[in-house]
Structure formats: structure tokens, C-alpha cells
């Protein structure tokens, strides 16, 4: 018997535009299943359908059969589905509500009326599995530790089907590899693991099945290596379009310290106009700090950062303008930057003109939202 099975599933949010069409997939126990595809194609929607969030919390028109352990979940309440399907969402901060690791893990177990003895045992098991300590303060955890905590909290409740929505988003390479290795071990122990993820280079060595979501369809990928090569080539080809020779930013001997602790030291490099730059490094090494320095949200303790920005559409920046008007910052959590009630109002809120806002919306494929 499969853990999850979708038969002839169609879904739309408004009854008109279909998000998913004729989905037929089967996910067995004992396997790590990857759901991949471009943003906006319907991966998270698929998660919401399997977990019962659709239609219990999020409205929409759904047809077909969604089977969990061979039983159609149509008409079941969310609480009934959640007893069989655990969900780990992307943003750990939105899921952590307790002060300590112990209390956070215990919270879900208490809601399921576990005995105190069973709760204590579950905490011991998942803390050991996820390399956490009972007494740790949640607010002091790193991004990677928070991700492990919300995964541990889900596992402690005992569901054998676990879905993780982009669990590697806040993890460095080491942390991502460790989490995927743990998920691989859980699958070998009989769990059904479903991972929605973009970081194919990290996840593919750990997964058994790959499902690609595109153009409303969900397709099982047979050749994982070929799939990774095709996706990587697509990214590389896009990067070839960009080149530059003159400097946009110049950093010279830049250092940044907090309470006499060096976060960055003697950073010197140039960023060219028209270029794409990727900052790589382990969690806590200073990547975000460096971005905050470049965007002038922080000022360096030592050294200089100079800029020479020409607007892409021909309006030359003046030195009299404030730095924040020249450098845009997109945060990791979009909830920190969304304020307006509709997509159109959000895009036009700070735009230099409505026409330019419409152009950008079309380029990013969100004009119809």
C-alpha cells in the first residue's frame, strides 16, 4: 500500500485557472521523494492538497482522489489528516512558539494527548536524531538549528508521512547535507519523506524518486542525473547573458565588528556592472552582514565601500540621493516586505510610475495575480 496516492486530481483556486491538472502519482513508504520545479508552478499547492490544508483552510475547487494510506481524505477534517501527515514549512520562525527546545517539541505531543512518559521519550529520541539539546533557548538557535527543531517537533508527533517545504532554504551546505542524511535514515526506517526543494545538487544524492511540476502537470523523472544536468544547463545559459567591465561597487579593506568580535575582516573586492555575484559560505560566516554593508543598512567598522550606479533605464544616479534609493534589498522572508492587500498595489507602491510597475510585473510573471 502506498503512503500517498493522487488519482486524476485537478485543482484551481478560483474555479477558472487550473493550477494542477490530471495529477496521477504514488509515493510509497521507505522512500525519499523530491518534488521539484520552478517557483509558482504548484509545488506548494500539491503539499496543501496532500496535507488537507486544501480545502480545509485554503479554498479551491478540487476533483479526483487523494488517498492517504489507501483512504480518500475527502470530507476529513484537517486534524484527522494531520494525525497521519506531518508538515514542516519553510519559515521556522513562524512555527516556533515556545522558549526552549524541550517545550517546543512537547507542544505538539500534548495536543495529541500523549502521556508525560511518552512525551519525554519522544523528546529524547528526536533530540538525539536532530542533534539538539532539551535546554537550548529557541531564540538563540541558528537558522539551521531552528530548521532541525521544527523537523524534530513534527517527527515527535509520530506521523510516518512527513512533507518538508524547502527545508534547506536557511541551511549551509554542511547543515543541508546533515538534514538530508537524517531524512534518508528515516526513509530506511519506513517513513515516507516528501521534500519540496530547489537545491538539486544537495538533495539528489539522497532521494529515491523525483517528481517535476511544470505547466500544471506532475511528471515522474526516471533519469535523475540527466534531470540535474538539464536544470543546471538552463541556469548556466541564463548567466552567460550578463557581463561587465566597469565597477558598480568597490570594497577596500572592509571590516565589521560587534562587541569587539570580528564578523568580517579585510574584505577587498569589486562588483562589476551587469554581473551576477553569488556569496557562498557556512551559516554565520558573515554573508548577510556583507550584504547589509553593501546596501548601507550597516556601516563598516573599518575600510571603505564606494559605488558608481547608473540606472538601468538611463537615469543617472546622483551622489546627493540617499544610498537606499540606489540599492534594493530583497530579504529572505518575503513577509517582512509585503504590506499592500493586492499584488498590483504592492508592486506599484514604490514604483517610479505605474507603467514601469506593469512592465516589471509582466517580466516576473506576476501581472495576472
What are these regions (language model features)?
Residues 162-166:
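Catalytic Walker B motif of ABC-type/P-loop ATPase nucleotide-binding domains
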Residues 137-141, 145:
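Conserved ABC ATPase signature
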Residues 36-38, 280-282:
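The feature captures the beta-strand-to-loop junction immediately N-terminal to the Walker
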Residues 117-134, 355-369:
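Conserved ABC ATPase "signature" region
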Residues 51, 295:
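Helix-to-loop junction immediately C-terminal to a conserved catalytic motif
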Amino acid at each position: 500500500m502506498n503512503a500517498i496516492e493522487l488519482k486524476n486530481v485537478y485543482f484551481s483556486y478560483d474555479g477558472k485557472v487550473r493550477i494542477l491538472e490530471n495529477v496521477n502519482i504514488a509515493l510509497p513508504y521507505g522512500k525519499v521523494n523530491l518534488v521539484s520545479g520552478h517557483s509558482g508552478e504548484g509545488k506548494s499547492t500539491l503539499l496543501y492538497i496532500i496535507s488537507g490544508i486544501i480545502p480545509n483552510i485554503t479554498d479551491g475547487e478540487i476533483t479526483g482522489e487523494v488517498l492517504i494510506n489507501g483512504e480518500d481524505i475527502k470530507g476529513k477534517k484537517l486534524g484527522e489528516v494531520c494525525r497521519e501527515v506531518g508538515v514542516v514549512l519553510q519559515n521556522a520562525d513562524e512555527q516556533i512558539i515556545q522558549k526552549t527546545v524541550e517545550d517546543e517539541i512537547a507542544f505538539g505531543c500534548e495536543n495529541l494527548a500523549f502521556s508525560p512518559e511518552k512525551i519525554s521519550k519522544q523528546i529524547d529520541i528526536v533530540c538525539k536524531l536532530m542533534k539538539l539539546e532539551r535546554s537550548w533557548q529557541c531564540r538563540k538557535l541558528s537558522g539551521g538549528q531552528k530548521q532541525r527543531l521544527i523537523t524534530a517537533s513534527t517527527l515527535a508527533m509520530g506521523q510516518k508521512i512527513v512533507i518538508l517545504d524547502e527545508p534547506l532554504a536557511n541551511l549551509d551546505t554542511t547543515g543541508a547535507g546533515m538534514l538530508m542524511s537524517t531524512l534518508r535514515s528515516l526513509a530506511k526506517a519506513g517513513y515516507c519523506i516528501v521534500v519540496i526543494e530547489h537545491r538539486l545538487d544537495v538533495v539528489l544524492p539522497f532521494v529515491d524518486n523525483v517528481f517535476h511540476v511544470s505547466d500544471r502537470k506532475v511528471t515522474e523523472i526516471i533519469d535523475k542525473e540527466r534531470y540535474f544536468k538539464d536544470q543546471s544547463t538552463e541556469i548556466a545559459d541564463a548567466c552567460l547573458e550578463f557581463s561587465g567591465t566597469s565597477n558598480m561597487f568597490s570594497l577596500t579593506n572592509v571590516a565589521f565588528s560587534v562587541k569587539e568580535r570580528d564578523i568580517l575582516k579585510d574584505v577587498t573586492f569589486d562588483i562589476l556592472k551587469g554581473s551576477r555575484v553569488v556569496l557562498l559560505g557556512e551559516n554565520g560566516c558573515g554573508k548577510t552582514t556583507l550584504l547589509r554593508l553593501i546596501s548601507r543598512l550597516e556601516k563598516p567598522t573599518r575600510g571603505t565601500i564606494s559605488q558608481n550606479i547608473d540606472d538601468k533605464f538611463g537615469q543617472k544616479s546622483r551622489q546627493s540621493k540617499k544610498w537606499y534609493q540606489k540599492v534594493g534589498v530583497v530579504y529572505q522572508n518575503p513577509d517582512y516586505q509585503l504590506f499592500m492587500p493586492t499584488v498590483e498595489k504592492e508592486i506599484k507602491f514604490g514604483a517610479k510610475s505605474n507603467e514601469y510597475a506593469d512592465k516589471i510585473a509582466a517580466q516576473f510573471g506576476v501581472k495576472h495575480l
